[in-house]
């Protein structure tokens, strides 16, 4: 069954231009991934009828995998399948595939070509009786990955989970939680980006108000998920259950091959994965779980200690008229720091002869006091060994300037005390915190909101750490020695 449907899907992909599919956020799941997702369900085989939903069904690969899994497990009841799909090019293929499934299984099906989000209610106070036709026992999905404007109909329909311009994938996910019967299960393949940060905060609050995570699968290699699609977005499979009763542990599995042949499983305490602030951590081994345990035992943050990280002030391509390549004697210019000024030994090296290293402006929003800072690169490549790459900026090295500025591809932390400055640097430049951030955030971007939320020691301890580092090489090795002593 699955292979026949897969072949029709491959034929469609070969004919449909990728740009057309990208307009829908449309990427098709591989057969092995679909099979793995379907086997994650704990189907109740005693139910006389099962209601199954696949929103954004595409050609029906995931629906077929779920139905086939039920048949393989010996389910003898009736399967009622509902599929949403709005792409008129793919709907005829979907209907053909569902009819094929109908001939081989005890199955009824409906294909809805309406908008999955806007055609049904979404609110905690909606009468359950009014929602009965939108309730399902099991939901499987590969939701569309597409950023939409904050005033798009879908965003306006679901303000409870939106912050700024949302992505359709988590609106589909939130609506699917709304669609689940109590104790129902959902298995979705989604990007990893939802696990942290302010952008997804409302969604995470909604998720954990209504459901709990049961299992997670991580793809070590990003190009193995959508085998014919050249997708490099970091993705995961997640299984949730509509219940507020938390399991003791979450099963986290991982694989680096397209056929899941090197599958590993790891049981992690629920409270290690889901933090009190609803950030989600996804360790894949005991070492990473140990990192989380050590850091999450601390209670302060950069924010509580009033040394928050901020993003650099200048978007250089928007401010070209105030950028200068060199100092000009007749006007007042100030240093403008870029990520390229952060050296590998933790020093700030400026100027280096690049264009736009000076700024001439009196606009307060583009200038900051010439104080002591830690500069942190906002972007690193996937191949680089460290995600947190920082340098110590000392105002005493540039005494003639009252102000400086920072390009928005770096983050900065201002510290009045030198001991505090070096102590915070020791934390961020340590292996422990680099590992912690990598577990928290799978992307290559260093987000100030997430760094500000990372647990750190109290100010007195950080100052003592800084006193130990002051005057020493600013290497990770030295930082590790100090951090190991205090944390």
What does each model-identified segment do?
Residues 45-49, 73-78, 104-107, 131-134, ...:
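Short helix-terminating capping/connector loops at secondary-structure junctions
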Residues 74, 230, 404-405:
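Short, flexible turn/loop "capping" segments at secondary-structure junctions
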Residues 22-23, 27-36, 57-64, 78, ...:
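Signature of N6-adenine DNA methyltransferases within the class I
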Residues 293-487:
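Polybasic, glycine- and aromatic-enriched phosphate-binding surface used to engage nucleic acids
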Residues 106-116:
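Conserved SAM-binding strand-loop segment of SAM-dependent methyltransferases
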Residues 53, 82-84, 112, 187, ...:
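Hydrophobic/aromatic beta-strand patches that form the interior of the parallel beta-sheet core
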Residues 1-75, 82-100, 120, 143, ...:
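Class I S-adenosyl-L-methionine
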Residues 50, 137, 373:
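Conserved acidic residues
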């Amino acid at each position: 069954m699955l292979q026949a449907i897969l072949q029709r899907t491959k034929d469609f992909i070969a004919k449909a231009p990728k740009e057309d599919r990208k307009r829908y956020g449309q990427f098709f799941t591989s057969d092995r991934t679909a099979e793995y997702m379907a086997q994650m369900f704990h189907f109740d085989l005693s139910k006389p009828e099962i209601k199954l939903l696949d929103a954004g069904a595409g050609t029906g690969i995931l629906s077929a995998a779920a139905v086939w899994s039920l048949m393989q497990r010996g389910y003898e009841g009736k399967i009622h399948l509902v599929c949403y799909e709005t792409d008129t090019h793919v709907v005829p293929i979907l209907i053909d595939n569902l009819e094929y499934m109908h001939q081989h299984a005890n199955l009824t099906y409906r294909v809805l070509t309406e908008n999955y989000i806007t055609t049904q209610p979404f609110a905690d106070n909606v009468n359950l009786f009014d929602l009965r036709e939108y309730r399902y026992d099991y939901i499987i999905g590969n939701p569309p990955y597409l950023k939409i404007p904050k005033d798009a109909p879908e965003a306006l329909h679901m303000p409870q989970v939106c912050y700024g311009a949302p992505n359709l994938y988590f609106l589909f996910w939130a609506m699917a939680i709304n669609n689940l019967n109590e104790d129902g299960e959902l298995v979705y393949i989604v990007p990893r980006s939802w696990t942290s940060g302010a952008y997804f905060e409302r969604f995470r609050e909604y998720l954990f108000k209504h459901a709990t995570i049961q299992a997670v699968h991580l793809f070590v290699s990003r190009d193995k998920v959508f085998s014919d699609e050249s997708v490099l977005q970091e993705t995961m499979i997640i299984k949730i259950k509509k219940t507020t009763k938390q399991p003791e542990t979450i099963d986290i599995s991982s694989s680096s091959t397209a056929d899941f042949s090197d599958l590993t499983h790891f049981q992690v305490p629920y409270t290690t994965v889901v933090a009190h602030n609803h950030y989600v951590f996804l360790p894949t081994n005991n070492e990473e779980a140990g990192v989380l345990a050590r850091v999450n035992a601390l209670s302060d943050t950069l924010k509580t200690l009033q040394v928050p990280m901020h993003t650099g002030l200048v978007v250089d391509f928007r401010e070209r008229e105030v950028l200068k390549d060199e100092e000009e004697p007749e006007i007042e210019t100030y240093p403008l720091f870029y990520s390229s000024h952060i050296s590998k030994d933790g020093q700030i090296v400026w100027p280096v002869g690049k264009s736009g290293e000076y700024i001439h402006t009196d606009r307060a929003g583009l200038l900051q006091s010439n104080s002591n800072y830690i500069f942190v690169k906002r972007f690193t490549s996937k191949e680089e060994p460290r995600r947190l790459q920082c340098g110590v900026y000392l105002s005493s090295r540039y005494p003639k300037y009252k102000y400086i500025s920072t390009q928005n591809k770096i983050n900065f932390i201002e510290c009045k005390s030198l001991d505090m400055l070096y102590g915070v640097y020791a934390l961020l430049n340590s292996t422990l915190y680099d590992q912690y951030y990598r577990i928290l955030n799978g992307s290559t971007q260093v987000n100030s909101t997430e760094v500000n939320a990372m647990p750190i020691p109290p100010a007195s301890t950080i100052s003592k750490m800084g006193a130990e580092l002051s005057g020493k090489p600013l290497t990770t090795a030295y930082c590790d020695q100090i951090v190991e002593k205090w944390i």
